């Protein structure tokens, strides 16, 4: 009886020790929504996203003398497209195809530079996101949003530490997008 319980328990602990941590980072920034503009009733915008980063990695970390590449848990272009759709809907726009203004949200850079030693780690995260507004009348506007975030901690940087840094810089960028009215003014001038 004792062997029937002990053997599976020992095997379980041995296998658990071999498990590698996941190589994805849970990207879930806080979405800030802007104030509604009641004068926008009926204005439709179309929205799409693009990820133009040269490398899809969010971070590269050395663990057990090997470089581990960490990627996002979901496609960033769809995440940011969803964010922009929520922000435009909150402002009072309708989102759909063939609007008088097309918005494209582009991820140019999102990366966490992780440096770690024996007792400390540093995570320097940068985001560079652009929104290109193109009106049917030919007018065009590009607005860039940039943010950076640095954090230090003890020992080794975990996936959660890196995810928190990435989510923090994305949350700051999304808040900037929400507070900025330049795209909103461009749409108002070119959608009528």
Curated annotation (Swiss-Prot):
Q: Where in the cell is it found?
A: Cell membrane
Q: Does the keyword Zinc apply?
A: no
Q: Where is the signal peptide?
A: 1-17
What are the protein's UniProt keywords? Cell membrane, Lipoprotein, Membrane, Palmitate, Signal
Question: Chief localization class?
Answer: membrane
Write out the transmembrane intervals: none
Which cellular components does GO assign to this protein? plasma membrane
Q: How does it sit in the membrane?
A: Lipid-anchor
Note the superkingdom of the native organism. Bacteria
- What InterPro entries does the database record attribute to this sequence? Uncharacterised_YajG
PROSITE patterns hit by this protein: PROKAR_LIPOPROTEIN
Lipid modification N-palmitoyl cysteine sits where? 18
> Where does lipidation (S-diacylglycerol cysteine) occur on this chain?
18
Q: Which NCBIfam families match?
A: PRK11627.1 (NF008637)
Q: Which family does it belong to?
A: To H.influenzae HI_0162.
What is the protein named? Uncharacterized lipoprotein YajG
Q: Where does this protein come from, organism-wise? A: Escherichia coli (strain K12)
């Amino acid at each position: 009886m004792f062997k029937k319980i002990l053997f599976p328990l020992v095997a379980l602990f041995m296998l658990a020790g071999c498990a590698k941590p996941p190589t994805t980072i849970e990207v879930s920034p806080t979405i800030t929504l802007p104030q509604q503009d009641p004068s926008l009733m009926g204005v439709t915008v179309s929205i799409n996203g693009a990820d133009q980063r040269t490398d899809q990695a969010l971070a590269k970390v050395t663990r057990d003398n090997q470089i581990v590449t960490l990627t996002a848990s979901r496609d960033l272009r769809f995440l940011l497209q969803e964010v922009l759709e929520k922000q435009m809907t909150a402002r009072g726009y309708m989102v759909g195809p063939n609007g008088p203004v097309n918005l494209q949200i582009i991820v140019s850079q999102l990366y966490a530079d992780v440096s770690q030693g024996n007792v400390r780690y540093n995570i320097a995260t940068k985001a560079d996101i652009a929104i290109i507004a193109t009106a049917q009348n030919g007018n065009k506007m590009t607005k860039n949003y940039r943010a950076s975030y640095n954090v230090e901690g003890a020992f080794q940087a975990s996936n959660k530490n890196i995810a928190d840094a990435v989510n923090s810089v994305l949350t700051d960028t999304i808040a900037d997008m929400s507070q900025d009215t330049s795209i909103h003014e461009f749409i108002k001038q070119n959608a009528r």
